[in-house]
């Protein structure tokens, strides 16, 4: 591809992911709190539910959710926010998760250990006669099972409490497809959409998040053979490079190539299930 081709695709992706050319953290906070509040009221439901991992994304989305239900209550609408801790046994960075909960200040906190369910599913797969190619493949699949068990737990609570599940996907993760389909990608509303990682951190900082939260190294921490593996190691590019791409800045050819490879390979994650009427795309 030529430089012009790269730039053309970059502009199209930025538009698709709704990344604005300018960023004002305080304005984004108010806009996103208002969005959450108006949406919940429009549904007639009463509760937001979100899993809090300890990272900046869930911390930021959680604080926005709490402020949105407080705004609704001040306006006479009964609403509340439930933060869920969803560890897989003992979380490696539990101290960070507790710090995040203190920042979010949710109305209610529920803790559900997904390890028994995730491990039982893996055992059932193995007992069925299914054989994994390698231990690494089994570990990867097991990690996605954990993410989907977390989704199940959040929807169980939402279903019982007239609730809506919040997701933490933002433009950088959406671009790279770095979420589990029907796992952490399974949600009803995405208050961080349109923000790249740099801007999520800017919102978190403006909300009063301490630097240990704002600058925590992003990790899905789903794989037991590679605990706390940073997202950037999986990408092969840094968040700064991804964010520069999303802000329309020129990046190195290797960054263009890596980003576009991840973006094209994860297109199905950003779409509703395909039918014969919409695939292949015209």
From Swiss-Prot:
<dbReference type="GO" id="GO:0009435">
    <property type="term" value="P:NAD biosynthetic process"/>
</dbReference>
<feature type="binding site">
    <location>
        <position position="168"/>
    </location>
    <ligand>
        <name>ATP</name>
    </ligand>
</feature>
<dbReference type="GO" id="GO:0004359">
    <property type="term" value="F:glutaminase activity"/>
</dbReference>
<dbReference type="InterPro" id="IPR022926">
    <property type="entry name" value="NH(3)-dep_NAD(+)_synth"/>
</dbReference>
<feature type="binding site">
    <location>
        <position position="197"/>
    </location>
    <ligand>
        <name>ATP</name>
    </ligand>
</feature>
<protein>
    <recommendedName>
        <fullName>NH(3)-dependent NAD(+) synthetase</fullName>
        <ecNumber>6.3.1.5</ecNumber>
    </recommendedName>
</protein>
<feature type="binding site">
    <location>
        <position position="173"/>
    </location>
    <ligand>
        <name>Mg(2+)</name>
    </ligand>
</feature>
<keyword id="KW-0479">Metal-binding</keyword>
<comment type="subunit">
    <text>Homodimer.</text>
</comment>
<dbReference type="GO" id="GO:0005737">
    <property type="term" value="C:cytoplasm"/>
</dbReference>
<dbReference type="GO" id="GO:0046872">
    <property type="term" value="F:metal ion binding"/>
</dbReference>
<feature type="binding site">
    <location>
        <begin position="51"/>
        <end position="58"/>
    </location>
    <ligand>
        <name>ATP</name>
    </ligand>
</feature>
<keyword id="KW-0460">Magnesium</keyword>
<dbReference type="Pfam" id="PF02540">
    <property type="entry name" value="NAD_synthase"/>
</dbReference>
<feature type="binding site">
    <location>
        <position position="219"/>
    </location>
    <ligand>
        <name>ATP</name>
    </ligand>
</feature>
<dbReference type="InterPro" id="IPR014729">
    <property type="entry name" value="Rossmann-like_a/b/a_fold"/>
</dbReference>
<feature type="binding site">
    <location>
        <position position="148"/>
    </location>
    <ligand>
        <name>deamido-NAD(+)</name>
    </ligand>
</feature>
<feature type="binding site">
    <location>
        <position position="181"/>
    </location>
    <ligand>
        <name>deamido-NAD(+)</name>
    </ligand>
</feature>
<keyword id="KW-0520">NAD</keyword>
<feature type="binding site">
    <location>
        <begin position="268"/>
        <end position="269"/>
    </location>
    <ligand>
        <name>deamido-NAD(+)</name>
    </ligand>
</feature>
<dbReference type="InterPro" id="IPR022310">
    <property type="entry name" value="NAD/GMP_synthase"/>
</dbReference>
<comment type="pathway">
    <text>Cofactor biosynthesis; NAD(+) biosynthesis; NAD(+) from deamido-NAD(+) (ammonia route): step 1/1.</text>
</comment>
<feature type="binding site">
    <location>
        <position position="57"/>
    </location>
    <ligand>
        <name>Mg(2+)</name>
    </ligand>
</feature>
<comment type="similarity">
    <text>Belongs to the NAD synthetase family.</text>
</comment>
<dbReference type="GO" id="GO:0008795">
    <property type="term" value="F:NAD+ synthase activity"/>
</dbReference>
<comment type="function">
    <text>Catalyzes the ATP-dependent amidation of deamido-NAD to form NAD. Uses ammonia as a nitrogen source.</text>
</comment>
<keyword id="KW-0547">Nucleotide-binding</keyword>
<feature type="binding site">
    <location>
        <position position="188"/>
    </location>
    <ligand>
        <name>deamido-NAD(+)</name>
    </ligand>
</feature>
<dbReference type="GO" id="GO:0003952">
    <property type="term" value="F:NAD+ synthase (glutamine-hydrolyzing) activity"/>
</dbReference>
<dbReference type="GO" id="GO:0005524">
    <property type="term" value="F:ATP binding"/>
</dbReference>
<keyword id="KW-0067">ATP-binding</keyword>
<keyword id="KW-0436">Ligase</keyword>
<dbReference type="InterPro" id="IPR003694">
    <property type="entry name" value="NAD_synthase"/>
</dbReference>
């Amino acid at each position: 591809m030529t430089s012009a081709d790269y730039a053309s695709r970059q502009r199209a992706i930025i538009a698709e992911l709704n990344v604005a050319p300018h960023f004002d953290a305080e304005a984004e906070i108010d806009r996103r709190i208002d969005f959450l509040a108006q949406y919940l009221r429009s549904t007639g439901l009463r509760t937001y539910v979100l899993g809090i991992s300890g990272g900046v994304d869930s911390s930021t989305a959680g604080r926005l959710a709490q402020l949105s239900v407080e705004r609704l209550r001040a306006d006479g609408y009964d609403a509340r926010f439930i933060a869920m801790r969803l560890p897989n046994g003992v979380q490696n960075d539990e101290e960070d998760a507790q710090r995040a909960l203190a920042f979010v200040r949710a109305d209610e906190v529920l803790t559900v250990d997904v390890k028994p369910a995730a491990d039982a599913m893996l055992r059932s797969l193995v007992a069925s006669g299914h054989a994994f190619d390698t231990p690494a493949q089994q570990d990867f699949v097991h990690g996605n099972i954990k993410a989907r068990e977390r989704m199940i737990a959040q929807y169980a609570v939402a279903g019982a409490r007239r609730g809506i599940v919040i997701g933490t996907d933002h433009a950088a993760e959406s671009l790279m497809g770095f979420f589990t389909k029907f796992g952490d990608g399974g949600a009803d509303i995405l208050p961080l959409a349109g923000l790249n990682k740099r801007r999520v951190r800017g919102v978190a900082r403006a909300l009063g998040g301490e630097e240990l939260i704002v600058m925590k190294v992003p990790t899905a921490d789903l794989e037991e053979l590679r605990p706390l593996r940073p997202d950037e190691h999986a990408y092969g590019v840094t968040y700064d490079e991804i964010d520069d791409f999303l802000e329309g800045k020129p990046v190195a050819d290797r960054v263009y190539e890596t980003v576009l490879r991840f973006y094209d390979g994860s297109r199905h994650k950003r779409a509703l299930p395909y039918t014969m009427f919409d695939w292949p795309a015209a």
